[in-house]
């Protein structure tokens, strides 16, 4: 999530449909390039959330684990808002 995305979210602005479509396309391309099937990605998300939850309380409703591609490099990105440490 970029700073602009955060500002837009705080101000209640809706993303442009072109931006949404671009993000979805990037996600599809990232999945294709990584050769990870959706079931494996879901399992990874659950396990990442489980491990992080052992150390800090996270906001699951706002958290996100996704694949992002930039300059032909795919990264697994976890954006997990921390409520407090345990």
From Swiss-Prot:
Protein name per UniProt: Cell division topological specificity factor
Superkingdom of this protein's organism: Bacteria
HAMAP family: MinE
Lineage of the organism: Bacteria, Bacillati, Cyanobacteriota, Cyanophyceae, Synechococcales
Biological processes per GO annotation: cell division; regulation of division septum assembly
The entry's keywords: Cell cycle, Cell division
Gene assigned in the entry: minE
Family per record: Belongs to the MinE family.
Function noted in UniProt: Prevents the cell division inhibition by proteins MinC and MinD at internal division sites while permitting inhibition at polar sites. This ensures cell division at the proper site by restricting the formation of a division septum at the midpoint of the long axis of the cell.
Organism, as annotated: Parasynechococcus marenigrum (strain WH8102)
